[in-house]
């Protein structure tokens, strides 16, 4: 019997002056960037957690500790490719990705096509199997005040070649 598994991932990082804003592997022009040990790409971190969780392989912190100097400033696309390798090694393939970025500022919509392209390349997945939505927090809370950005990702994985 074919195994089909669902994963869910979440990440949040604060916005600070002096960092590049990188989401989905796309550098977005803005006066602030996300603070973190790596490049702080909230979307790709949530994606890694969703994929690892679906395969019962732990979470991003287990595989890429924020106390490990090897991951200081690392491009999170490298982490996604490594997670993809782990899933493949475990006998799984990614079926689809559905993601939501929650940011009051800056606007994400113009950058979504590039994010989809990057994720499709890193997971060797057709772009049509990846959906990314952008929402605001309606000026509520930390995100609504422009102090941080959140990403949530749901994924479906399956063993073998067909669902």
From Swiss-Prot:
Annotated binding of 4-CDP-2-C-methyl-D-erythritol 2-phosphate, by residue: 11-13, 37-38, 59-61, 64-68, 103-109, 145
A GO BP entry: terpenoid biosynthetic process
Cysteines engaged in disulfide bonds, as pairs: none
Catalysis performed (reactions): 4-CDP-2-C-methyl-D-erythritol 2-phosphate = 2-C-methyl-D-erythritol 2,4-cyclic diphosphate + CMP
EC number assigned by the record: 4.6.1.12
Pathway connected to this protein: Isoprenoid biosynthesis; isopentenyl diphosphate biosynthesis via DXP pathway; isopentenyl diphosphate from 1-deoxy-D-xylulose 5-phosphate: step 4/6
GO MF annotation, one: metal ion binding
Entry function: Involved in the biosynthesis of isopentenyl diphosphate (IPP) and dimethylallyl diphosphate (DMAPP), two major building blocks of isoprenoid compounds. Catalyzes the conversion of 4-diphosphocytidyl-2-C-methyl-D-erythritol 2-phosphate (CDP-ME2P) to 2-C-methyl-D-erythritol 2,4-cyclodiphosphate (ME-CPP) with a corresponding release of cytidine 5-monophosphate (CMP).
Family the entry assigns: Belongs to the IspF family.
Protein name as annotated: 2-C-methyl-D-erythritol 2,4-cyclodiphosphate synthase
Record lineage: Bacteria, Pseudomonadati, Pseudomonadota, Betaproteobacteria, Nitrosomonadales
Primary gene name: ispF
């Amino acid at each position: 019997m074919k195994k089909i598994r669902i994963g869910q991932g979440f990440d949040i990082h604060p916005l600070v002056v002096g960092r590049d804003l990188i989401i989905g592997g796309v550098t977005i022009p803005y006066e602030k960037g996300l603070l973190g040990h790596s490049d702080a790409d909230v979307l790709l971190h949530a994606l890694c957690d969703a994929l690892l969780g679906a395969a019962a392989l732990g979470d991003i912190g287990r595989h890429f500790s924020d106390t490990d100097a090897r991951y200081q400033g690392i491009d999170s696309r490298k982490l996604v490719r490594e997670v993809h390798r782990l899933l493949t090694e475990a006998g799984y393939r990614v079926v689809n990705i559905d993601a939501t970025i929650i940011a009051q500022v800056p606007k994400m919509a113009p950058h979504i096509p590039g994010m989809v392209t990057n994720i499709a390349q890193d997971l060797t997945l057709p772009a049509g199997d990846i959906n990314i939505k952008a929402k605001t927090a309606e000026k509520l809370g930390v995100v609504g005040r422009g102090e941080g950005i959140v990403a949530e990702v749901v994924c479906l994985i399956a063993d073998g070649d067909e669902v």
